[in-house]
């Protein structure tokens, strides 16, 4: 597997893939979406962009916590657009 994500010089690509999958599953479950729909929504989010910045160690948080961040971001955007 190609190294995509690192933290302190260590390859965490596999771990990030697992974390991302679990976050997407949580989003799909809460929103009653299929995996692909949740995948597309999450990958367009600022939360995903933050998660990709591995030095902040957001990837070490539980998937539910990261999903909560995503939903807070989504709610904030809905309020701004309303």
Give a label for each model feature.
Residues 1-82:
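C-terminal alpha-helical interaction appendages
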